[in-house]
Amino acid sequence: MSFKGRSYRSLDPKGRLMLPPEVRDALLAVSPEGRVSLTTFDGCLVAYTPEDWEKFEAGFARIKNPSRKMRDFRRLVIGGVEELCVDKQGRVKLSRAHMEYAGITKKVVIVGQGSRFEIWSEEELEAVIGQDFGDVTDELAESGVDFPI
């Protein structure tokens, strides 16, 4: 499964987010309840399938004697996770804490990131993607990624 593209949505007054059909169907395909692990990072919410979240969390368990900064990072990411299920209407309810962290009020954008997807406030995402990414092509090339645009 691969999450791709952007989908612009609005929360309802109760903080529920209607997932795009392709996202909803992908979640229901891997979990009958449409479970998703939603955590905080980079000023947005990051959603993982149950299997991918278990792998991610297991990676932290393998770190022996983590630094204070790593433990603080773990507190942010693992401590910020909430397990959600897609309701019968294809929605997930965002918590107040998650909405505050990501600056979400009403308008959101769901952004595919391959094995996971992100939920951004529309304003925050516009600021992020409005950056100059000219130097990123050098970083891609140094990593062996050909990006011929």
Swiss-Prot record:
An annotated GO cellular component: cytoplasm
All copies of domain SpoVT-AbrB, residue ranges: 6-52, 81-124
Keyword Nucleus: no
GO terms under biological process: negative regulation of DNA-templated transcription initiation
Compartments it resides in: Cytoplasm, Nucleoid
Coiled coil residues, start to end: none
SUPFAM superfamilies from the UniProt entry: AbrB/MazE/MraZ-like
Domain of life: Bacteria
Keywords tagged on the record: Cytoplasm, DNA-binding, Repeat, Transcription, Transcription regulation
Family per record: Belongs to the MraZ family.
Subunit record text: Forms oligomers.
Descriptive protein name: Transcriptional regulator MraZ
Classification of source organism: Bacteria, Pseudomonadati, Thermodesulfobacteriota, Desulfovibrionia, Desulfovibrionales
Primary gene name: mraZ
